[in-house]
Amino acid sequence: MSTEPLPSVPAPSDFIREIVAGHVAEKRYAKIVTRFPPEPNGYLHIGHAKSICLNFGLARENNGQCNLRFDDTNPVKEDLEYVESITADVQWLIAGWAEHCLAFKPKGAHPARITSNSQPDYYLGPVAPAALTTEPFFASDYFDQLYEYALTLIRKGQAYVCDLTPEETEKYRGAPDQPGQESPFRHRSVAENLDLFQRMKAGEFPNGARSLRSKIDMTSPNMWLRDPLLYRIRHVTHHHAGDKWCIYPLYDYAHCLSDYLEGVTHSVCTLEFVDHRALYDWVLTSLDLPRTLPHQYEFAKLTPGYTLVSKRKLLTLVNEKVVTGWDDPRLPTLSGLRRRGIPASALRRFVTSVGVTKFDSLTDIAVFEHAVRDELNQVALRRLAVLQPIKLVLTNLAPDEVIECDATNNPQSETPTTRRVALTREVFIEADDFAEVPPPKFFRLKPGGEVRLKYACIIKCDELVKDATGRLTEIRCTADLTTRAGGPNVARKVKGTLHWVSASACIEAEVRLYDRLFTVPEPAAEEDFLKVINPQSLTVVTAKLEASLAEASANERYQFERLGYFALETKTAEPGRLIFNRTISLKDTWAK
């Protein structure tokens, strides 16, 4: 992994970047340090891409670093599977753009203890490139330090062990329009609290029997300050820490201290954590930590139309087998988008175009699709493919005649290259490119009509062949070979141009035509989102492809001319069986 800074590029402008720019100008921090801290309890989705791009973008633009840290404080819901998936997704999204800013856990795994003013401090700070390993940060690596900090809060009279059940705790909490009640255990002595907390750690009590709570203000209008829990008992094996612990810190307690330990300067999160900021600050200031404290900033999350980003609802889609798994190309998960063939650069472009604001709103999915089309138009190799083939016979070509035609690989390239495609007596065209009784302004093939076969020549429809049931089986045409490239009549114009493949020089492949999963822009607003599933979100066809696609690469993207953009499917493909996934159609078929 390169640690060389990339060339300076103009950064988008938004309120968070303006704040950071001000801090850089006044030299408030030696280095800008951000973090992306997912909980490993699910797969990342398109909404997370905004946070990834913002946090890594801030580091990239300011020669800083961004830590990938797993906030793994709830072992009940977390799993190594998600750690591996999230790590792969993040590295895919930032590859070639900001991977030099990605900081991994330093060698030695744990921060060294520093003592200042008799208070424990385990500050880790920014990571030097030479110290990088390939393992991400884990909040669970700080459990020893977090436990010591909790003891400090108890000694200062700012935390206590509470025996209320979870249900009683919620009842005592009150409501937004009425104050909470103090726990009857709130005024235990420091000595008793220390003893009970240490016994909690030793595993003497069952799940839910006791918790450690902060002592703040049960009458606060901010519900998050009504003596929130700091630790709870969970006799569960942890995916990373094993069986060492049976007490686990709550997110709001662990998160701010993990930021501090890693030297994070700007803790950027979504608007749902606005009310949590007061607790974030309370924990840090209550411990009298000697080094510069991180600060939390909030921005609006990304919610695209025609999709869902709720983990619970995405899980329903998986469990109900509406989709094939978390990486189904119809899902907004990053693994699903990647499998569908979405370029990481297109996703970054989309996130940049949406911007960073303080107001939640629904983002038109067409904006995302436009970014994908624009990106793929620049990089995709053009190829010929026919999804719904019907045979067309060029009667003036000999049965074994082969005419080599030059086809452009990518007209958008600064130095376009070509390949050879074979024109033979029998070819396939799309069934809907022919109409025996054409509607008005139909410029494709019809009886007596002419069209151009792209890269080849103009043909004229002379005769139709049907079977005993009246089904069309063959279209017989004449090829005007004088209209080929280099021919005397190459400039002759016709209104329609069709794609095609040679019947004798083509290959068969399965093609999966993916579309939007929902029929309405806001499926989350529906009473039952399963009732607005698009029944045509996946259509599978056996297509005829030009022979060169037998050597297709998973690293390439392809435009099947006049059809859309496609990527090679690798997960379910088998030797000798090609599968292509449609990434996106050439045009927005949903536009009104």
Which residues are covered by each model-predicted region?
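Active-site cores that bind ATP or allylic diphosphates and position pyrophosphate for catalysis
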Residues: 74, 80, 110-114, 126-127, ...
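Core subunits and conserved enzymes of cellular information-processing
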Residues: 273-277, 281-283, 345-348, 352-355, ...
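Intrinsically disordered or highly flexible coil/loop and linker segments, enriched in small
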Residues: 29-30, 99, 159, 206, ...
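Glycine- and acidic
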Residues: 34-41, 66-73, 260-268, 328-334, ...
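Long, charged, mostly alpha-helical binding arms that flank functional sites
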Residues: 292-371, 375
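Charge-rich, well-structured scaffold segments of protease-associated domains
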Residues: 83-92, 149-155, 174, 343, ...
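N-terminal Rossmann-like or analogous alpha/beta NTP/dinucleotide-binding catalytic cores
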Residues: 2-182, 245, 272-296, 301-306, ...
